[in-house]
Amino acid sequence: MSMEAPRRGRRWVSLGMIALLAAIGLGLYWDQLSTPSGITPATSPRRAEGLLLGRLPLPMEPSLLSPLERLLEPPLRYKLMTIRHIPPVKPGTGMPHPYVGDCIQCHLMVGGPAAGSQFKTPYGAVLENLSRVRKLGPPILPTSRQPHPPAGRCIKCHDIVVKVPVDKKGGMRWQL
């Protein structure tokens, strides 16, 4: 009898160790089940949507939460504003509008090159001269691509159209 008592104790210890290892393995497996498809707490909503739907939405495409965001935050109302004249600016002054590109693409610089000194092709020079009577080009956005050879500053032939908020409480910010 004295020989069987230690064996019975070893059996319980070995069964306890096996049960403990099984519980640890089941816990690790359960942890993997609780995060489906690799979604972790650090996953962005865009990546989570891609994992769930099988593709990533485009940057300008509305997300799954966009309808809710639109309900909570009323959209800003904008009106169109046509710019027919662009004033010269001093180098180093603040920008009164969002960044569109290099200042010299639209503005003349005070103390800089004179008007008409921008590079233009002979065809562009003819277009610029014809636009002195009446602007030949259609209204364009500040971010529009140039569909013709260089012809000096865009404002000479085109009116520039921007969207300006109707409610100016937050300051005058363009929407391009």
Curated annotation (Swiss-Prot):
Its main location: membrane. A motif (MCR 2) lies at residues 140-160. Disruption phenotype: Cells have a weak magnetic response and make magnetosome membranes. Magnetosomes are about half the size of wild-type, but nearly as numerous. Deletion of this gene with amb1002 to amb1007 give smaller, elongated magnetite crystals, does not alter subcellular localization of MamC, MamF, MamI or MmsF. Deletion of genes mamH to mamV (amb0961 to amb0978) gives cells with no magnetosomes and no magnetic response. It is found in: Magnetosome membrane. Its cofactor is heme. Residues 31-176 are lumenal. Probably binds 2 heme groups via the 2 magnetochrome (MCR) motifs. The chain crosses the membrane at residues 12-30. Induction: Part of the probable 18 gene mamAB operon. Residues 1-11 are cytoplasmic. GO terms for cellular component: magnetosome membrane. Heme 2 binds at residues 154, 157-158. GO terms for molecular function: metal ion binding; oxidoreductase activity. Keywords: Biomineralization, Heme, Iron, Magnetosome, Membrane, Metal-binding, Oxidoreductase, Transmembrane, Transmembrane helix. It is a single-pass membrane protein. Heme 1 binds at residues 103, 106-107. This is Magnetosome protein MamT. It comes from Paramagnetospirillum magneticum (strain ATCC 700264 / AMB-1) (Magnetospirillum magneticum). The gene is mamT.
